[in-house]
């Protein structure tokens, strides 16, 4: 009987891990776009930007391949920004512009300077968008 109990407990724990999910995405709508932020783990976050009035991306990310976890976050809001914090990473979204900033322990990791969308009108990608994001970098800081 003990073996059946422990086997059942193990199976339930396994199922709970398989079905864990991230918190609901945080969305900020500006005059030109919708910015959606989803934490997949305390140190991994997925950001999706969609032109305002267009259908959002429903495809699975090719970059963030981790299955979403149940991440404990703190959300706060003031007049200019929404802030979402995990135990490792802080994400700030400017409510007016939709620009995103990533911080760790209060120090800037990466900050968007601007973004834009170019609609694809022909070929297999017709109807999708090419997104351009410009980041604020230090003078000698490269991105790989």
Label each region the model flagged.
Residues 4-13:
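Sec-dependent N-terminal signal peptides
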Residues 5, 18-144:
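N-terminal accessory segment at the very beginning of proteins
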């Amino acid at each position: 009987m003990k073996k059946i109990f422990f086997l059942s407990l193990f199976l339930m724990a396994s199922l709970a891990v398989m079905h864990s999910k991230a918190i609901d995405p945080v969305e900020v709508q500006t005059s030109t776009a919708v910015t959606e932020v989803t934490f997949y783990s305390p140190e991994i976050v997925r950001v999706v930007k969609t032109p305002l009035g267009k259908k959002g991306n429903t495809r699975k990310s090719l970059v963030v391949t981790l299955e979403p976890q149940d991440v404990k976050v703190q959300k706060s809001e003031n007049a200019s920004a929404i802030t979402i914090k995990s135990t490792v990473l802080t994400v700030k979204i400017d409510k007016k512009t939709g620009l995103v900033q990533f911080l760790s322990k209060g120090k800037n990791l990466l900050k968007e300077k601007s973004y834009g969308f170019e609609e694809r009108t022909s070929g297999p990608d017709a109807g999708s968008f090419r997104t351009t994001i410009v980041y604020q970098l230090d003078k000698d800081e490269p991105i790989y």
